């Protein structure tokens, strides 16, 4: 219904019929009537994703409706899975939920993979509400750390776009306050240096030869001691 009754702004033509905002409101109200806790995990994901599609197609809801959606979803954020946290962080940030900055930065700091970290950083990039200087500092410090992450050909540009959007969302006062941090250049290290830091503190066991490892692997790897 959202796709049929509303066309997103990026693909809208002058000849297209006007957005059916009444249908958009009905979709949002129907979602608000659902009991999140009674839904299965896959249904919860579908529910939040439907909110996203509806808001892209019909535009940001009124403050009253936005507050209702925030009240419905914020109680379940953070969730138990990355997939749900990603969608909730993205949706609540779009609605300018007052707690999403703190919760999102906490998830960003705890995320164990660069992929998860990138999604949280991307979701928070346009958020303007709920920030403190400490949270902003943690957020922009992440961009200094991620300079040593690795990805495909467009990886660096993708991160640059996220950071540019985040800087653009700052007020003039915030830009002035964070100026030293925003001007700081990341220390880019070689893959060998990054690996050496990751291995720091580990005990040297043995300088293995390829022939030794080949023999061990051919015997099977069951009942190994990882201690």
Residue ranges and their predicted role:
Residues 1-227:
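Long, ordered, helix-rich scaffold segments
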């Amino acid at each position: 219904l959202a796709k049929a009754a509303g066309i997103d702004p990026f693909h809208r033509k002058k000849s297209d019929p006007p957005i059916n905002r009444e249908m958009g409101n009905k979709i949002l109200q129907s979602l608000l009537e659902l009991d999140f806790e009674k839904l299965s995990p896959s249904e919860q994901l579908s529910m939040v994703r439907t909110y996203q599609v509806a808001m892209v197609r019909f535009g940001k809801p009124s403050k009253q409706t936005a507050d209702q959606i925030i009240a419905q979803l914020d109680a379940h954020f953070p969730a138990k899975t990355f997939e749900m946290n990603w969608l909730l962080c993205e949706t609540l940030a779009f609605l300018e939920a007052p707690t999403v900055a703190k919760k999102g930065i906490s998830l960003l700091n705890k995320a164990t993979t660069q992929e998860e970290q990138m999604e949280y950083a991307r979701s928070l990039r346009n958020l303007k509400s709920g920030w403190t200087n400490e949270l902003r500092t943690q957020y922009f410090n992440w961009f200094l750390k991620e300079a040593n992450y690795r990805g495909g050909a467009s990886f660096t540009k993708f991160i640059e776009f996220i950071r540019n959007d985040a800087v653009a969302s700052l007020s003039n006062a915030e830009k002035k306050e964070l100026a030293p941090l925003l001007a700081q250049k990341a220390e880019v290290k070689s893959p060998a240096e990054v690996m050496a830091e990751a291995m720091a503190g580990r005990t040297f066991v043995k300088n293995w030869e390829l022939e030794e490892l080949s023999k061990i692997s051919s015997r099977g790897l069951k009942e190994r001691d990882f201690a």
